[in-house]
């Protein structure tokens, strides 16, 4: 009850009581207006003190309610995003766990923080895999899409020689595409008749080079090319013959060793080299032997001098 109704007293004189009641009411209203004007200044301080009067339990309930609302908003935002396979998102899951821990620890974080973490999560989804990650053993080979695919492709096991790539003709009889490589001795036996043609060609070119009329008419560059060709053909023919001779020497030596043996014995590469050198040295002339011995002596001295220079340093 207000102050006015508390001070009302019962009386029998109605007219006089009405006048006095009106005066009292006016006085009370005036005092109330003055009190309100004075209390406006203190209203802000009283509002601040209102929160301090609340209990800790009510504050905790309000805080939990706000957190539940924030989590619900985040779940609604994450629903449209398509989840990736389990193997591809270990980093994303770790990031989500960190977000939830941070939301629980920070009670005053708003919806802006949730949006920030959501953007970070999207960046993790769009981030490419590490290039240095170990590839599977049986994974298909990867080629850059920026590089144009060549019309002639390399087949593993059938590597094309550089000469064939440059457009120079290659004999199909000696390519790997026809099967395994044939033994050199078999090839040599089949195409030994070509040596006669090579020797005739060398003789014909030497005859032209010795002809003065041809030399005067031909250009100097053409003559030099012919001389170079003659030298290369001679060296190739001689190397083929030397190789054939070495194989024959080893074959004869192994034949003598394996006479009367059930199991054939084959020499190693180092032993073959020694047998060939011994045969050549035995079948040399006296002057050739002296030259070979002198060459070996100089070679040995050079090695010794190098060793002395190394120790003097």
UniProtKB/Swiss-Prot annotation:
Disulfide bridge map: none
Biased composition (Basic residues): 127-138
Ranges for region Disordered: 1-157, 287-313
InterPro entries: RRP36
Keyword Nucleus among record annotations: yes
Entry's localization field: Nucleus, Nucleolus
Keyword Ubl conjugation: no
Acidic residues: compositionally biased ranges: 13-25, 39-49, 100-121
Keywords: Coiled coil, Nucleus, Ribonucleoprotein, Ribosome biogenesis, rRNA processing
Coiled-coil ranges from the UniProt annotation: 188-244
Highest taxon of the lineage: Eukaryota
Biased amino acid composition, Basic and acidic residues: 85-99, 302-313
Record's GO cellular component terms: 90S preribosome; nucleolus
GO biological process: maturation of SSU-rRNA from tricistronic rRNA transcript (SSU-rRNA, 5.8S rRNA, LSU-rRNA)
Pfam family, one: RRP36
Main location, first listed in the record: nucleus
Function as written in the Swiss-Prot or TrEMBL entry: Component of the 90S pre-ribosome involved in the maturation of rRNAs. Required for early cleavages of the pre-RNAs in the 40S ribosomal subunit maturation pathway.
Family stated for the protein in its record: Belongs to the RRP36 family.
Quaternary structure and partners: Associates with 90S and pre-40S pre-ribosomal particles.
Protein known as: rRNA biogenesis protein RRP36
Gene from which this protein is expressed: RRP36
């Amino acid at each position: 009850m207000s102050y006015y109704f508390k001070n009302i007293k019962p009386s029998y004189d109605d007219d006089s009581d009405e006048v006095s009641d009106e005066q009292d009411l006016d006085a009370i209203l005036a005092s109330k207006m003055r009190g309100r004007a004075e209390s406006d200044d203190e209203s802000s301080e009283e509002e601040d003190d209102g929160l301090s009067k609340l209990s800790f339990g009510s504050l905790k309930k309000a805080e939990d309610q706000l957190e539940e609302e924030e989590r619900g908003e985040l779940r609604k935002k994450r629903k449209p995003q398509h989840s990736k396979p389990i193997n591809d998102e270990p980093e994303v899951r770790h990031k989500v766990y960190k977000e939830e821990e941070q939301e629980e620890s920070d009670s005053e974080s708003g919806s802006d923080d949730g949006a920030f973490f959501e953007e970070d999560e999207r960046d993790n989804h769009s981030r490419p895999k590490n290039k240095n990650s170990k590839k599977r053993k049986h994974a298909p080979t990867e080629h850059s899409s920026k590089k144009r695919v060549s019309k002639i492709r390399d087949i593993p096991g059938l590597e094309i020689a550089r000469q064939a790539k440059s457009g120079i003709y290659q004999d199909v009889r000696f390519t790997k595409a026809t099967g395994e490589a044939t033994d050199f001795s078999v090839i040599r036996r089949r195409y030994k008749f070509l040596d006669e043609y090579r020797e005739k060609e060398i003789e014909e070119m030497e005859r032209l080079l010795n002809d003065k009329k041809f030399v005067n008419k031909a250009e100097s560059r053409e003559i030099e090319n012919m001389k170079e060709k003659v030298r290369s053909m001679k060296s190739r023919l001689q190397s083929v013959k030397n190789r054939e001779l070495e194989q024959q020497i080893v074959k004869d030596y192994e034949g003598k060793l394996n006479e009367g043996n059930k199991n054939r014995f084959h020499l190693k590469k180092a032993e073959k080299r020694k047998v060939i050198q011994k045969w050549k040295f035995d079948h040399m002339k006296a002057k050739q032997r002296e030259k070979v011995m002198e060459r070996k002596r100089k070679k040995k001295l050079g090695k010794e001098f190098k060793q002395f220079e190394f120790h003097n340093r």
